[in-house]
Amino acid sequence: MRSVRDDRAVRTVVAKVAHDISARPPLRLDVGQQVDVGDRDTEWPEFVFVTASQGSGWVPARHLSASSGTAVVVTTYDTTELPTQVGDVLEVVVEDLTSGWLWCRSSEGREGWVPVKTLEAR
C-alpha cells in the first residue's frame, strides 16, 4: 500500500452516494505506539476499535500486532475521513480494497478515507 502522503493519483472516481464523516476527531497512529483494542466492527469486519493516549477510532486490525487486548501499531495509520456529496470527483491516492476504503483527494485538495461502496469509476 502506498504512503498516505503520496501525491500521485491512482485513478479518478465519482461519489454516487454522499458520505458523512463521524463527529469523532481523526486519530493518527504511529509505528510502535501502544493501543487498547476493543470490539470488531460488524459492518466493516476488517476494523477494530482502538483507544490510544490521544483519542480513539476504527483501524484495520492488520495495522496492529494483535486484534484484541493491548496491541502495538505496526503500520502508521490515519483515520481521517473525507466527506463527499453525490457527484464529487475524487482522485484515488491509496487503494485499500481489503478494508473497503480508499484514501482520496478532493478538487479542493482535502484528503481522507472514503468507503468504496459510495464511489463509482469515472
Say what each PLM segment does.
Residues 1-122:
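Src homology 3 (SH3)-mediated interaction modules
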